[in-house]
Amino acid sequence: MKIEQGFVLTRHARDIAGQTQIELWLATPSGPTQLIIRGERPVFFIEQSASQEVIRIAAELSITPSLSPLSLRSFAGHPLAACYCNTIRDSQILAEKLAQADMLILEADIRLADRFLMERFIQGSIEFTGQIIDFGHYRQVQQAKCRQGDYLPALNMVSLDIECSEKGLLYSIGLDSPMDSRVIMVGQPEPAETPIQWVEDEYQLLKALIAWFEQFDPDVIIGWSVVDFDFRLLHKRAEFHKLKLTIGRAQQPSFFRTASQTQQGFISIPGRVVLDGIDTLKTATFHFRSWSLESVSQELLGEGKAIHNVHDRMDEINQMFRHDKPSLAHYNLQDCVLVNKIFAATHLLDFAIQRSRLTGVELDRIGGSVAAFTNLYLPQLHRAGYVAPNLQPENWIASPGGYVMDSIPGLYDSVLVLDFKSLYPSIIRSFLIDPLGLIEGLKLPIGKQADHAVPGFRGGQFHRTKHFLPEMIEKLWAARDEAKRNQEKAFSQAIKIIMNSFYGVLGSSGCRFFDARLASSITMRGHEIMIQTKQLIEARGYQVIYGDTDSTFVALGGQYSQQEADNIGHALVSEINQWWTEHLKQEYALTSILELEYETHYRRFLMPTIRGSETGSKKRYAGLKGDGDNEQLIFKGLESARTDWTPLAQRFQHQLYQLIFHGQDPESYIRTIVEQTLAGQLDEQLVYQKRLRRRLHEYQKNVPPQVRAARMADDINAKLGRPLQYQYRGTIEYVITVNGPEPKEYSKSPIDYQHYIDKQLKPVADAILPFIGKQFDELIAPQLGLF
């Protein structure tokens, strides 16, 4: 039988006629392929001593499990048996009943399709054989046998966007892909530059969408809030018309569900992956001031949508649908094109594919750090003779966070930043920190010999040879270095996120491997390393003014040229790395992977005080680096770097620091900005933009300004018969007026300029002016008298 290659798009398991069926949809060089695997039995693990009780309880439920004693043990050391059932339903019912009877059941939450792939080390890429039936549009493989593969797919992608009325009636659906680009529009045919497929009504619109998917058959669907908005509404309208949305492969219907607590939507479409632009960018650690399509496309591409305000947009869409459908089609398709351009510019599809190849998580998985770790770790753990523990819901001890040193405030010349390269991953590798290593290490005495354990913190100790995590990180580290050399940005970013998430997973009570001894052995070792490194630097005559997690800020004590600073930086890291290598070898008989790097030389650097005190602040600083065309002003944690400060404060801070860092007098600039603010010349810079982190009705006692503005906006929306915007979180833009906060789109009262002087300009100025002997209030006193 010929062995073929493919890439897993979707996975699903269900019960059919008394046995299970796993359905995997793949992208292959020969087109879409459906693998059918029958008869895989769901399994969970029980203590061998409970076998008879399990059989008794199963009999009461008319379930006949198969129990197999194993050589595997729990982390507590108890011998285990595997409990197999014929169907997923039987397995779930039995596991639930045993849990109610307070019996230990392990790994009952691992889904059948996930376990099937995981235990075969299948991570995205797959090799398969079986009986192939060709259905033209796709192939089906019966009695499929699978193993790990190494195949990089070329997936075809469509960008989808809908336009609708404020009541949620569909007007049109835009689809943009290399295969076909069109808008399906309700209405009578009329000439248009945009390719339009005209349909009679909403029902025919949905039928045309189903036919489009059947004809052009994309692997991936992308969009902006495409799950929570577009697909939610498409399903709602299909339900209204009693129509199954059969947009899956093999004419299978898509399935939409809403999480009960968060109201977040989830969609599954057999054979097709749905990637939401916002969620995928967040998973790939992108940050934007606003997540609107307009804002992100302006920032990334320098182009955006034609209509900005949400209500203007709604009114204009309604107008276009009634009187100018060709313009609506152009607008609809433009959104699809923008999303395609954003995905191309950020390599998001490549990122999702590489993440799946590295960890085995689904292409459309949001976040997924715990799932990634479980996928990689569980099969190795089984082969080492253990079954994974369950989540520990209570009684867990929080581990200390990263090291943050008290800063020494001041305005400095020549500050170096020295960074430990991937500090937490390198601690895991150097000190052999690992869940299995902890269980095995606790059986040994602590010491330097080969048969002794490596000491950790809070009672943790680690086996010198029985571990997986250090090797997992070593492989990822090497892959990332290669990706960097090959300039594969998406691959490098995917590896970095996964590697850094491993500490977060071990330190999260949402992970089955969470143990305070693991997390603390990483963070507390980090504290120790940072404190010792500070002492080593200060012993060489330099002043450490701040330290944060893995970065150390070193004041050289005067003005140094770039070359002089570089020489000092390189010498320092070389000496300190050598010290750590010798220290780990002598104290622990370990090989150090710790690597301090010389990161940056700031020609001028400000470490501010905490507002209203003389104490140095944390995670807040600014610096000037480079010169000429390469000069850069960097802000961390200050107003310029925070999205909840107004553009006025951000621009003021940027220019003020620019002047002071270059030794220029800022007095005239400060007075001018205050004058312009009071004269109403900078009103467009006074808009606050803040996220509502809860539902509007949940704000009871403390009602911040953004909530007051949001409530006012939705009260007005209700009176005007417009949809409410802010009930379920969201982002609000508002201004402070003499009558308090008002939403930007409905603001009527005069602006409270004094508020902006006191709350936006003054805090920015007060952070830096005292270091050059000036006071904001004294500088602006004459201006205030004029107004």
Q: In which residue ranges do the predicted regions lie?
A:
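Short, surface-exposed ligand-recognition loops at beta-strand->loop->(often short) alpha-helix junctions
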Residues: I46-E47, I522-G526
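Gly-rich Lys/Arg/Thr-decorated short loops/hinges at beta-loop-alpha junctions or inter-strand turns
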Residues: S181-T194, V505-S520, M524
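Catalytic P-loop NTP-binding/switch module of NTPases
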Residues: A479-R485
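The two-metal-ion catalytic cores of nucleic-acid processing enzymes
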Residues: M1-I278, T283-P389, I397-L416, F420-L476, ...
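Flexible, glycine- and charge-enriched loops at secondary-structure boundaries
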Residues: P195-E202, A519, T523, Q562-D566
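Core alpha/beta catalytic barrel or barrel-like domain that forms the active/cofactor pocket
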Residues: I307-D312, G504-S508, Q543-F553
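Short, hydrophobic beta-strand segments
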Residues: A81-C83, D276, S509, F513, ...
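DNA-dependent DNA polymerase catalytic subunits
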Residues: D15-T28, P32-Q34, F343, L349, ...
